[in-house]
A protein has these predicted regions:
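Conserved glycine(s) of the Walker
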Residues: 1
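N-terminal phosphate/diphosphate-binding loop that engages ATP/GTP or pyrophosphate donors
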Residues: 4-80, 84, 89-92
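Conserved catalytic-core segment of NTP-binding enzymes
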Residues: 9, 99, 104-166
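Glycine-rich phosphate-binding loop signature in dinucleotide/nucleotide-binding domains
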Residues: 93-98
């Protein structure tokens, strides 16, 4: 759901005449090219759907093969996310584009890195990049409670929630 909504948002911005871009700190569950490099699947989908003029290599600094939570994929693949790398990539995209749609890597409390050296959560990325959020949720049983808890957690921790999409 998040990737589809991000693609719709990026497309709407591009169709409105803005130099729009997309960014995601970490993406897991990707397939390999014949040369062994990973294809950032979510980034590719958004780029193609929204017709963005942006190279895939600028869209996501951490790309993992295993379809696991980013912190587990990072541990298994030996490439843990570093906040300065995420910030630098985001700033570079912002310098080249008028507006950037940022997709979360999981929910607000999803760990991107959780090892003996550092604990990095999606919440940290949202705070450090100064982002406002739109919560994207499935319209299923139990979702209202989950969304309200997420929104209240975010507000209590100073994170702006601009909307909710079911």
């Amino acid at each position: 759901g998040k990737t589809y909504v991000a693609a719709l948002m990026a497309k709407a911005l591009k169709d409105a005449g803005l130099n729009a871009a997309y960014y995601k700190a970490a993406v897991s569950g990707n397939v390999r090219r014949p040369d062994g490099s990973l294809i950032p699947g979510d980034a590719r989908f958004v780029r193609e759907f929204a017709h963005l003029d942006q190279g895939e290599e600028t869209m996501c600094p951490y790309v993992y093969e295993h379809a696991w939570s980013p912190h587990l994929a990072a541990q298994a693949e030996g490439n843990p996310p570093e906040l300065p790398v995420i910030q630098k990539g985001f700033q570079a995209v912002c310098q080249q584009h008028e507006i950037v749609t940022v997709e979360g890597s999981g929910g607000i409390l999803c760990p991107l890195r959780h090892d003996e050296k550092e604990k990095l959560w999606l919440e940290d990325v949202v705070q450090q990049l100064g982002l406002a959020s739109v919560i994207v949720a499935h319209a299923g049983l139990g979702t209202i409670n989950s969304v309200v808890l997420t929104a209240e957690y975010m507000r209590a921790n100073g994170l702006a929630v601009k909307g909710i999409i079911f």
